[in-house]
Amino acid sequence: MDHEECKTQGNNYFKQSQYMDAIRCYTQAIELSNGTIAAYYGNRAAAYLAICTKSSLQDSIKDSLKAIELERSFIKGYTRASKAYIHLAQYDQAASIIVRGLVFDPRNNELLQEKNQIDSIQRTISSLTKEKALSNPSSSLNQIENVLSQSKYNTQLQVLKARVLIELKQYPQASNLMTTLLQEDSRNPEYLYVRGLSLYYQNNFPLALQHFQNSLTYDPDYSESRVALKRLRSIESKKKEGNEYFQSKNYQAAYDSFTEALSIDPKLETMNSQLYSNRAAALVHLNRISEAINDCTSAVTIDPNYGKAYIRRAQCQMKQENYEDAVRDYEKAQSLDPENGELQRNIKEAKIAHKKSLRKDYYKILGVSKEAGETEIKKAYRKLALQYHPDKNNQLPEEEKAQAEKMFKDIGEAYSVLSDEKKKRQYDMGQDENGMPFDADMGGVDINSVFSQFFNQGGMGGGMGGGGFGGMGGGGFGGMGGGGFSGMGGGGGFGGMPFGFDMGGGGGYGGMGGGFGGHSGHSHGGSRSRSSRGGNEYR
C-alpha cells in the first residue's frame, strides 16, 4: 500500500468519525512519503482536533505548524492551529498564527473569518462578568455554552457555567462540572467553593462543609467560602435548636427557631421545605392550624415530592374538617410511598369523614362535642327545644319564624339520633340503622313526639312534677296534637312561664293526667308552684 492509499483510507475512517484509525493511516502516509507532504500533516491535525483532548489539541497544533513549515501557502494549517489554540483558551496564540497567515495572504476569506471568530469570542468573554451572568442566568448560559463549544478548556468559563447552573437550580450538573475541574486541580479554592455550593444546595451539608473548609485551607482569605461556611453553620444551629425545643415541648420557641432558620437563605429550597414542615408541626401544637397548612403548602411547593409534608397537611385538613383536601393529600402521599399501608387507612378514614360531613352535624346542632354523654346531650336538647319551640316563636316575622321552625326540627332529629345508643353509634360510623350511608334528612322522625316524650319522661330524669304550672292557659302547644303533657306531676297546674314567654289566659289542657286549668282547679293547690320568679324556673 502506498502513501496515497493510506491517506485515502484515513479519509474514509475520518468520515466515519473513527479518528484514531484515521490517525494511524495518516501516520503511515507520512512515513511512506518521508514526511514531505503538508496535506498529510494537515489531515492528521484535523483528526487530532476532532478528538479534542488537551493532548490531542497540542498534537494538532504541532502537525499544523509542520504543515505550514512544509508549505507556507497551506491555509488549513493556520486555521486548524488557531482552532486548537482557541479550544485551549490560548487566544493570543490563535490570533498570532492567523496574523502569520494574513501576512502571506491578506485577503484570504478563511483566515479573515477565523480572525473575526477570535475577536467575537474574546468580546463575549469580556462581557460575561460574574455579576452580569448571575443576574440573567438563562441568557448567559446560552452564551457560555456557545463559547465553550469552540473553547472547550476555558476553565474560567467552565466555573462561570457552574455558578450559572447553580443559579438555575441545576445542582447535579454544576457538581459534575466542578468534579472534572477538581480532578485536574484539587487544591483550587474557587473550584472547591463552587462544588461545595452545589452540594450545599443539594442539602449535602457534611460534604459541602468539607469543601468550604478545604477551600479556606488552601486560601484562608477566600471570602466566598468563609461566608458560605458561616451561613451553613447558622442554619444547622437554628434547625438543631428548633428540634430540641420541639422535643422538650416548647413549641413557641421551636417555631421561633425554625422561623430564624428560614430567614437565613431563601434559596436553600430542600432544607427550607423541611424547615417549613417542622414549623408546621410546631404550629399544630400551638393550635394555629391554618398557619400550619400554609407552611405545609410552602414545603410541597418547594419540593412536590415531599411526602411527609403532604401527610402533615392532610392531618391539619382533617382538624379543619376539610376532608376532600385531606383525601387528596393522603392520596398524593400514597403515590409517593405506595408501600405505606398506614396511608391507605388514612385515606379510608378521610373519605368516611367526608361522607359524614355531607350530613347534618347533629353534634354541632346541639352544640355539644362528639364525646358528649347522655346527660350533656339531654341538657343541650332541653335548652334548645324550649328556645326554638314554635309556640315561643309564633309572633316572629315569617322568615325568622321559618328559621326557628327548621332549627326546632333539626334539634329534634339530632336528639332522636344522639339519645339512642345504637343510632348514635351508627351515625358516628357514617351509617344508618340498615348499615347504609346515613341519611341526613331523618324524614320519618315526628319532632313533636320527640319533644313530648322527652318532657313526659322528665327530661333530665327529675320530672317536672311537684309544682303546678299555672297561667299556661290560652291555646295549647301547636302541633302537639291534643295529648298534652301527661305524667308531668300529680294534679299540679303549670305556674309561671316555663318557656320564658307568656302563654296568655284562657282554656286549659285536657287529658294530661291532671287538669291544666287556666286559673282554676289545682293551679295553686297541692305542691308548691314553680313560678316565673322561682329559683327553679325552666328556661
Curated annotation (Swiss-Prot):
InterPro entries: DnaJ_domain, DnaJ_domain_CS, J_dom_sf, TPR-like_helical_dom_sf, TPR_rpt. PROSITE patterns: DNAJ_1 (PS00636), DNAJ_2 (PS50076), TPR (PS50005), TPR_REGION (PS50293). TPR repeats lie at residues 3-36, 75-108, 189-222, 235-268, 273-306, 307-340. CDD domains: DnaJ. Residues 521-531 have a biased composition (Basic residues). Residues 512-539 are annotated as: Disordered. Residues 361-431 form the J domain. It comes from Dictyostelium discoideum (Social amoeba). Keywords: Chaperone, Repeat, TPR repeat. GO terms for cellular component: phagocytic vesicle. PANTHER family: DNAJ HOMOLOG SUBFAMILY C MEMBER 7 (PTHR45188:SF2), DNAJ PROTEIN P58IPK HOMOLOG (PTHR45188). This is DnaJ homolog subfamily C member 7 homolog.
